[in-house]
């Protein structure tokens, strides 16, 4: 993306879905001396963890484990700098920093998915499973604002889709029951509060008057 021109002319909309939660992260463990990075080595039979150096991290949790996504801030700025007039829409699992690093979240958010089953051991099925962490939306908002963007959100994907009128799209198919039930099942899946509906949506806009579609009255 670094080879692309900055601030493309015209109105642009850039949407990305679950981009930031797929980036590599650094894992830390809070101690009385400060956060210590959790490193990994091979002991000849398996991957094992080992303590790294004490790090300085602003507002770091005082207990438990947490992740830092070192690439998210710069990537968000790169995306924003590609837009002269328009919006960057971010769809991802995550929280504002105060929720992400809340005291009760002592094990962090690192998860592994193997054959569509979630578990918490990233050191098995190496190369055969997906690893993911929740996104720090406070960091993405700060990056967008530093790039001169206006920020709207956070809202849930469920709120966003209903606000842009997806419910009406379903109702428009009532005259054709097969299509109606297909659309309704899709809407239920996308807005399920225990699943995809929990995805958060953040909008960063430039040259857009008022709140962007999907965010009016939803915050």
Residue positions per predicted region:
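A mobile, often basic/glycine-rich helix-loop segment
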Residues: 15-61, 103-114
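A short SAM/SAH-binding and catalytic strip from SAM-dependent methyltransferases
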Residues: 5, 9-32, 65-70, 74, ...
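Short, flexible loop/hinge motifs at secondary-structure junctions
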Residues: 1-3
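A generic structural signal for well-ordered coil/turn residues at beta-strand boundaries
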Residues: 10, 34-36, 198
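Long, Lys/Arg- and hydrophobic-enriched amphipathic alpha-helices
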Residues: 52-219
């Amino acid at each position: 993306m670094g080879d692309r021109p900055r601030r493309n002319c015209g109105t642009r909309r850039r949407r990305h879905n679950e981009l930031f939660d797929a980036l590599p992260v650094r894992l830390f463990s809070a101690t009385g001396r400060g956060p210590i990075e959790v490193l990994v080595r091979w002991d000849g039979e398996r991957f094992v963890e080992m303590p790294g150096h004490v790090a300085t991290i602003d507002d770091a949790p005082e207990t438990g484990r947490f992740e830092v996504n070192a690439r998210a801030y710069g990537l968000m700025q790169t995306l924003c700098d590609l837009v002269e007039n328009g919006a960057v829409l971010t769809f991802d699992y995550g929280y504002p920093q105060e929720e992400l690093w809340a005291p009760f979240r002592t094990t962090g958010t690192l998860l592994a998915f193997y054959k569509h089953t979630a578990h918490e051991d990233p050191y098995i099925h190496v190369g055969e499973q997906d690893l993911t962490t929740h996104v720090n939306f406070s960091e993405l908002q700060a990056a967008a604002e530093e790039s001169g963007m206006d920020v709207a959100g956070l809202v849930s994907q469920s709120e966003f889709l209903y606000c842009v009128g997806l419910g009406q799209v379903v109702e428009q198919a009532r005259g054709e029951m097969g299509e109606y039930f297909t659309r309704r099942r899709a809407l239920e899946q996308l807005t399920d509060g225990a699943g995809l509906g929990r995805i958060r949506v953040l909008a960063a806009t430039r040259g857009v008057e008022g709140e962007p579609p999907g965010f009016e009255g939803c915050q």
